[in-house]
Amino acid sequence: MATIPIVIETTGRTERAYDIYSRLLRDRIILLGSAVDDYVANLICAQLLFLESEDPEKEIFMYINSPGGVVSAGLAIYDTMQYVMPPVSTLCLGQAASMGALLLCAGATGMRYALPHSRIMIHQPSGGYQGQATDIEIHAKETRRTRETLNEIMAKHTGQSMERIQVDTERDNFMSAEEAVAYGLIDKVLTSRERLEKKDAE
């Protein structure tokens, strides 16, 4: 198991220890740094709801480095991002693949970013089923419906047509950060924090 760093803050004569993720949360930063499953989704959703209760207007920053994961868990995060009142800014570092890419493009308009060497990948949902033929048919139908839902979400946030999304997600489709801008998955490639702060000040 990986060790979670602890940071110490000193205020006057008082010292307080935080794990690194709790300290980032104080600055309204959420890190999605793993595959998406129900446990991770519950943590992310809880953080979004907490930050909304702290300040319903102040921006939330979500950093994404994820290979994707369970669709239902990812959609729980997506729906919560859209539900909360504060705008959610997204930034990809490393990779945002599959459900990670969908969450990346679901950030507030004009506030979706990637670092220069990030990799974004979109594709159709996949799954394997076994059992009776009727059950397999039921699951296949549900997978097709899920794909339609994901395509609709991506079309909404990228401005691409449903037909284009359908074709482009047929197989694994990798993009550089610059290509993701052209496609509409993100709004800008950032090379330094100063560029982000200048944009926010404009």
Swiss-Prot record:
Transmembrane segments: none annotated. Fourteen ClpP subunits assemble into 2 heptameric rings which stack back to back to give a disk-like structure with a central cavity, resembling the structure of eukaryotic proteasomes. Belongs to the peptidase S14 family. One of its GO terms (cellular component) is endopeptidase Clp complex. It is an enzyme of class 3 (hydrolase). InterPro entries: ClpP, ClpP/crotonase-like_dom_sf, ClpP/TepA, ClpP_His_AS, ClpP_Ser_AS. Its main location: cytoplasm. Cleaves peptides in various proteins in a process that requires ATP hydrolysis. Has a chymotrypsin-like activity. Plays a major role in the degradation of misfolded proteins. It catalyses: Hydrolysis of proteins to small peptides in the presence of ATP and magnesium. alpha-casein is the usual test substrate. In the absence of ATP, only oligopeptides shorter than five residues are hydrolyzed (such as succinyl-Leu-Tyr-|-NHMec, and Leu-Tyr-Leu-|-Tyr-Trp, in which cleavage of the -Tyr-|-Leu- and -Tyr-|-Trp bonds also occurs). This is ATP-dependent Clp protease proteolytic subunit. GO terms for biological process: protein quality control for misfolded or incompletely synthesized proteins. The active site is at S98 (nucleophile), H123. Its EC number is 3.4.21.92. HAMAP family: ClpP. It is found in: Cytoplasm. One of its GO terms (molecular function) is ATPase binding. The keyword Protease applies. Keywords: Cytoplasm, Hydrolase, Protease, Serine protease. It comes from the Bacteria.
